[in-house]
Amino acid sequence: MNTFKISTIITAGGSSNRFGSNKLLEKIANKTIIETTIEKFLPFVDEIIIPASPEVQEKITIKNEKIKFTTGGKTRQESVYNGLLACEYRDFVLIHDGARPFIKEETIKETIEKVKKLGAVVVGANAVDTIKICNDKGEIISTPKRETVFHAQTPQAFKYLEILEAHEKLKGKNFTDDSSMMEYLGHKIYIVEASHENKKITFREDLN
């Protein structure tokens, strides 16, 4: 039976302009946000790569041989690519925002199970509001059914070589997340349904 290795890239860059300080170094229950996020993944993966500035690297005090650091990029996309290059294992990779510390262990486990079967998955929360699609004039042109609309979150998980290829082919282009790059190249991607609790810390109110 094949034993696949699971790599995880946890992004730890970003300007935190809207937060007012480096949000990853804010504390939740006496732990920084980035450390809280890292500890959620440690039991389930084989390595964790953290693209980050020296400032953030110095503040991560968790001692574990699974954790490795690499240089953060000017953009999230560059940081993820640096993380991919630093991976030791080349089977499957999860990519997660360091500012999403409320990820549930059950969601991590389901993401790993599904990426092994399906090859590319994205964690997302079903829309609770009615969504309107508009044209460039602001005119509403359609209203999709809510059950078909999801807010994309992380982790997003892929076959390592496929997401590496996507980053290399689309280097320098502005994509909002990794799954968008895979979609652009024609890959099929599947949803792992999660809750809205898996929010990204953007403002101070998000810590409540």
Q: Which functions belong to the PLM regions below?
A:
Residues 2-4, 149-208:
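Conserved alpha/beta core of the MobA/IspD/sugar-nucleotide pyrophosphorylase nucleotidyltransferase superfamily
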Residues 10, 34, 83, 96-97, ...:
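Residue-level signal for inorganic ion chemistry
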Residues 132-156:
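Short, flexible, basic/aromatic active-site loop/helix in glycosyltransferases
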